[in-house]
């Protein structure tokens, strides 16, 4: 069945203003790395996450995840996730945060493994295999039933081919959340829709073409 999945990057109080009936997953964004550990940046973020999780009392079907990274938020990911020891340490810390906050899982938003993302952030070809093992370790240390997903850069050249080992990763995750936006922006030479459903006159990239690209790689819609 289709799911409604939303990201939340607001403050502690604003979440109370939203009607969350019908939302399946709410992903709190963003947590970051502190050394090789998943970390909450400050007390304000901790209070916000607590209140987001508290929404489950009002909406019993709601699942709350935390998200690692975001645009510019994964500066050390390539280095940290380059060793098995650090990947295991991250997985253990993630399981601890999920349990202590009574959350339901994690969404990985590393932009991007193996290809250029945020300017100046390190990337290397080995990121692709390291991402796979990161997912393996998370599955190993998270408890059964915890949700594991990742955000995929549909608008990034080479992402589908160079960032993810789809055949190995997809059996281990619950969802892949396609970032089907930023197809046009301030650096574009022509105007176009920021988040196109279908391909346009000047660019093939769109929600439809991104989903088709995943299916061509063997990723099943369900």
Predicted regions and their residues:
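Short, well-ordered coil/turn segments that N-cap beta-strands
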Residues: 2, 60-64, 102-106, 144-146, ...
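Gly/Ser/Thr-rich helix-start
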Residues: 70-71, 106, 193
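Serine-hydrolase-like catalytic core of hydrolytic proteins
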Residues: 90, 94-116, 121-122, 126-130
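A cross-domain feature marking catalytic cores of carbohydrate-active enzymes
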Residues: 8, 30, 66-70, 110-112, ...
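Conserved, mostly hydrophobic/aromatic
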Residues: 26, 66, 108, 138, ...
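Generic structural signal for hydrophobic
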Residues: 18, 97-101, 169, 214
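Substrate-binding surface in catalytic domains of secreted glycosidases
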Residues: 35-47, 113-222
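Glycan-recognition patch characteristic of GH18 chitinases/ENGases
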Residues: 1-98
